Amino acid sequence: MTPPPPDSSAIAVRRSPPRSQTNRGKLDLDPVTVAAARDLARRVGRPIVELAEQHTTVSVERATLRLAGLAGADPEGIPWANRLLDAVRGDVGLGHGVALPVWDALVRGEAEDLATLAQKASAGSVRFRLPEGRDRVRARSASRRQVGAGIRRIDARRRERERMVKRYGDPRQSPWIYLIVATGDIYEDMPQAQQAAREGADVIAVIRSTGQSLLDYVPEGPTREGFAGTYATQDNFRLMRGALDESSKELGRYVRLTNYASGLCMPEIAALAGLERLDMMLNDSMYGILFRDINPVRTFVDQRFSRQVHARAGIIINTGEDNYLTTADAVEAAHTVTVSQLLNEYFAKEAGLEDWQLGLGHAFEIDPEVPDSFRMELAHALLARDLFPDAPLKWMPPTRHMTGDVFRGYLLDAFFNLAGTLTGQSILLVGMMTEAVVTPWLSDRDLALQNVRYVLNAAGRLAEDFHPSPDGFIATRARQVLAESIDLLERILAHESGGSGPGLLDAIADGTFGLMKRPADAGRGLEGVARKAPGYLNPATEILEAQ
């Protein structure tokens, strides 16, 4: 299924019409069982949503300031959004939000604009208060005007994307070919990304510098050095988007740009992505919880706000279920991927995202020495496709069992590509035969793209002829994974009935996902969480939730 264009007005004219929810798919899954799985996911996820509604974080509040136009950094490189937030928090706390005290100060004439106010607050020459009565009304009105202007800019960038997709068109084949480019130097990334697009890449992902997810601030400006990646900054987003717009015009197809809204600054990066017209964003709190030890409450709050921004911006999210299989066995833990996909679907839709924006993740990570490994990969991939028929599923290549033998790696990647086209995956991340050896050379990328192009061209519409036997190995395995997923969701709910809080938080603490144990009262960023006080105000949330 070709992924739909990232705009609601274009859904009705997709090349491949959405599959009806009454269509049982190639696996002939029992619709009652599927509905039960979704209901369980909703019941597991709802307490997390309620938790998110009751809290705010430093990054949510800084994102609100950024939407209002606050940018730049002090001479030490600390963003003014951080400086202003810290000053407000020091005077009145975080529980009422940043908007009321900040715009109260502006209305009172403490500064002419946000940037000046941030500079004065950083110097200690401004004191903030919680306004009441008419002062509160004036501060609220002023904050809504300024934040609303930022959200209208996001709306304009979304319409701009829609016009460009209409002008240049989407990729002619499915799945879309997704390629990673990141040297650390944005000025080196741009020509490499443009060349990758010429070689057939439809989506360019600029991975972030190692460890950026643990920074509690967003760096400023264009960057020319990074570690195994390039820093995510607003200027870097703008530069790469401009380069790929040139490629779109040159190639006659719209080339999409991806980055990462995860880690401690998830809401802020989501806001910057919307402002600079990025098209896809990695966005999954579980990755930060499990693999970066970020506090679960912090990142679930951040995730909800960031997904509300993505929904408004028409951005497709990519979730990180593939990461579970880098630490857990891909056969034994297959059901945890399905459970996470079901939960991510619930969380995403609750935040306002639509099916065409749900790039749910999964991966080709079964040990190739396991008998029938390819058949099991097909079963798992087809289960995801049949459970989420209208979602642009993201299919990730083998990494865990890449040994450094480039010939074996090239073969595994070909099988991965074949599985992707047979099972109707939507977004295919190009696998590298040099995985586990070196950061790919340009020649490695060229060979990898040749592999993808050959398989997609040779397979053609083979998926139309692929119909697993209803009682065969593939269908039976898929039903087994779905049954195990339901069993796990029921166990998570049982945790909750014990009265210890949201069952999902207990499951995360127990190491259910990816074998990592992450308790809710620990982890990085916990100090940046605050319970909302009566009278809390966030104009961005008000506007986003009113859509």
Question: Residue locations for each model-derived region?
Answer:
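Helix-rich catalytic cores of soluble enzyme domains
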Residues: 140, 144-159, 168-173, 177-426, ...
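Conserved active-site loop/cleft motifs that coordinate metal ions or position small ligands
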Residues: 427-431
